[in-house]
UniProtKB/Swiss-Prot annotation:
This is Pyridoxine/pyridoxamine 5'-phosphate oxidase. It catalyses: pyridoxamine 5'-phosphate + O2 + H2O = pyridoxal 5'-phosphate + H2O2 + NH4(+); pyridoxine 5'-phosphate + O2 = pyridoxal 5'-phosphate + H2O2. InterPro entries: Pyridox_Oxase, Pyridox_Oxase_CS, Pyridox_Oxase_N, Pyridoxamine_oxidase_dimer_C, Split_barrel_FMN-bd. Catalyzes the oxidation of either pyridoxine 5'-phosphate (PNP) or pyridoxamine 5'-phosphate (PMP) into pyridoxal 5'-phosphate (PLP). The gene is pdxH.
Length: 214
């Protein structure tokens, strides 16, 4: 069955982005836009699409939740042995996309990823709800399983094992930190004449910024 969507259109007319809104580095603007998304009560304001690729260039994406923007790095948590974890271990070049429909905004990030320090992963893991900590321990993320009953049974067994006790962070789970080298800010505008500004990291650690054609 063919599907046609050419008649689905929306005009973007809520906001603008001009050179006067920019900051010397992109990080203040990243902070401002993330805060705007939270304050506007957008749906999942910290959701971010993470793009990874194998060493020979086969890409994949998935959506995770940003948990910290710390020391100018974007931090999220996941299983090191998942598909994304394995791809990031083999090829540290990644991209991120934040999309806030309600604000008609996007941020696109390119950079290199590293595994977060264990003590920081431990500290975050301790803040997670009990069931989330148990789930992180028993899920062989991205691998085939016999059925849902398998993962439910494993969850029940691990829950009983740690009932009333501290659930330790598994060695296969922790944080990833993305250090950006390119950050683009996209603001939807009327007639598809969108505002786009690209920051790029220079060798001397300063940032260049250019307006891009929509």
């Amino acid at each position: 069955m063919d599907l046609h969507f050419e008649n689905i259109r929306r005009e973007y007319d809520k906001r603008s982005l001009s050179a006067s809104d920019l900051t010397p580095t992109p990080f203040d603007l990243v902070t401002r836009w993330l805060q705007d998304a939270v304050e506007a009560k957008t749906y999942e304001p910290t959701a971010v699409i993470v793009g990874t690729a194998t060493p020979d260039g086969h890409p994949s994406t998935r959506t995770v939740l940003l948990k910290e923007f710390l020391n100018n790095e974007f931090i999220f948590y996941s299983n090191y042995e998942s598909r994304k974890g394995q791809q990031m271990a083999a090829n540290p070049h990644v991209c991120l996309t934040f999309l806030w429909h309600e604000l008609e905004r996007q941020i696109h990030v390119e950079g290199d990823v590293r595994i977060l320090e264990p003590e920081l992963s431990d500290a975050y893991f301790a803040t997670r709800p009990y069931k989330s900590r148990v789930g992180a321990r028993i899920s062989p993320q991205s691998r085939p399983i016999p059925g849902r009953s398998f993962i439910v049974q494993e969850f029940m067994k691990e829950s009983l094992k740690y009932a009333g006790r501290t659930v330790p962070r598994p060695d296969t789970w922790g944080g990833f930190a993305v250090k950006p080298v390119r950050i683009e800010f996209w603001q939807g505008r009327e007639s598809r004449l969108h505002d786009r500004f690209l920051y790029e990291l220079r060798p001397d650690a300063s940032w260049s910024v250019h307006r891009l054609a929509p």
